[in-house]
């Protein structure tokens, strides 16, 4: 009954819907929970009985005390986020030849700094052994920047529609987390790969 469905949706457009113009981040503030952009809005209340267990699973394990899992965004969907200037996103505009490389070869662009020199930003792990593992995996180290690999890939995400980094934890971005061992204290985390260890000054 596509014709009837179309008529129903047309009725929805007459119910006062309009775009929210206060900024994407503000859209999720309490005072805007039932703004005209919301359709079938469900309001959130800070009281027992109005939550759900999925809240414990958002983000990474260190984002919230008691987090049980990690959720990952689909990379094809993330690539649909446009550039800041409104142009369609294309990896080759930032890293020429990226799309012609195999997935394993181009994984080199996502690696942390210091794998050649051992002079990384963080941790005391064996950087050289991590490099060997990634070479065996198939990462093309001829494209690697020992100091600057992190910055190069971070800029790819920062030059996008700002809703991207407001929705996802992107490579080498920082975010606030509070592991269950911290007693409610907040720490700043950076998403790096390969993981080595936590800083001894933070959980």
Describe each region flagged by the PLM:
Residues 184-203:
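Active-site beta-strand/loop architecture of penicillin-binding DD-peptidases
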């Amino acid at each position: 009954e596509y014709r009837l469905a179309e008529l129903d949706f047309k009725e929805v457009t007459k119910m006062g819907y309009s775009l929210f113009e206060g900024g994407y981040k503000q859209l999720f503030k309490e005072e805007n929970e039932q703004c005209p952009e919301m359709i079938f809005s469900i309001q959130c209340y800070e009281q027992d009985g109005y939550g759900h267990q999925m809240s414990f699973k958002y983000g990474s394990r260190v984002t919230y005390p008691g987090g049980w899992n990690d959720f990952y965004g689909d990379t094809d969907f993330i690539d649909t986020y446009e550039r800041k200037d409104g142009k369609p996103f294309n990896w080759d505009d930032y890293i020429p030849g990226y799309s012609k490389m195999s997935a394993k070869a181009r994984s080199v662009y996502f690696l942390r700094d210091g794998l050649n020199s051992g002079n990384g930003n963080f941790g005391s792990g064996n950087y050289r052994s991590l490099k060997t593992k990634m070479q065996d995996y198939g990462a093309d180290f001829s494209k690697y920047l020992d100091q600057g690999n992190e910055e190069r890939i971070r800029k790819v995400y920062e030059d996008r529609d700002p809703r991207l980094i407001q929705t996802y934890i992107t490579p080498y971005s920082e975010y606030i987390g509070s592991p269950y061992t911290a007693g409610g204290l907040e720490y700043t985390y950076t998403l790096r790969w390969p993981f080595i260890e936590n800083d001894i000054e933070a959980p």
